[in-house]
Amino acid sequence: MDYLASTTQTQPKTVIDAGCGWGLSGIWCAKHLQATVASLDADPDVIPYLELTAKINGAEVTPIVGRFEDLGSDLLSATDLLIGADICFWDELVDPVIAMITTAIESGTKRIVIADPQRAPFLAVCEHILEHFGGE
């Protein structure tokens, strides 16, 4: 959130919080960037916590139960900012996260920010994306 606050020059109008969990990053974007936020998670059991956390914080997000691979070019092409925090913690998530980021880039998503504590699966994603698309 500090990174987004310090590096966001233009306010994104639309944000997807991929692998949102309880949704803190997306809720922050809704509240502080006044963005329309879709919060996606594969686990339907997190949605009540997401909704409660949003309510407590006075923010509105749209919960979506789905997987990374469910984010198609139709949705990503209309997205200003794709965020994900701690979403690549298992080896099985490498390919779906790479596919999501690739689809976002090819669809014209304006900005992608993925945060991670530098686990090995995430580093594999980084290597692939840097090799094929560049980035920081």
Please report, for each region that a protein language model flagged, where it lies by residue.
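S-adenosylmethionine-dependent methyltransferases
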Residues: 1-136
